[in-house]
Amino acid sequence: MACSTLPKSPKDKIDPRDLLIPLILFLSLKGARSAAPGSSPHQVYNITWEVTNGDRETVWAISGRLYVSGRDPGLTFGIRLRYQNLGPRVPIGPNPVLAD
């Protein structure tokens, strides 16, 4: 049984976090293991999202645990996106080759 949590985006445009849903489904299917008779594996995948410095830095984290007897083969995976100031935008203008 897989479970995922995604916070709602405050923005109306497409949010890159929505692209992580296929990744969660892949992890859920890949991490599925056959359970012993009378028991079931409990998979839990959570996504946390955090914005620091306004919209300048975005952090995603995926953590998962598979509750089985013995050693826990859990995982932690993180993505960090930082926006950099590339300086003032300079207009390029139309391509002169296309004007012909």
Swiss-Prot record:
GO terms for biological process: fusion of virus membrane with host plasma membrane; symbiont entry into host cell; virion attachment to host cell. This is Envelope glycoprotein. Glycans are attached at N46. It is found in: Virion membrane. Residues 1-34 form the signal peptide. This protein is synthesized as a Env-vMpl chimeric protein. The sequence shown here corresponds to the Env homolog fragment of the chimera. The Env homolog part of the chimera has an internal deletion compared to other retroviruses Env sequences. GO terms for cellular component: membrane; virion membrane. SUPFAM superfamilies: ENV polyprotein, receptor-binding domain (SSF49830). Keywords: Fusion of virus membrane with host cell membrane, Fusion of virus membrane with host membrane, Glycoprotein, Host-virus interaction, Membrane, Signal, Viral attachment to host cell, Viral penetration into host cytoplasm, Virion, Virus entry into host cell. InterPro entries: FMuLV_rcpt-bd (IPR008981).
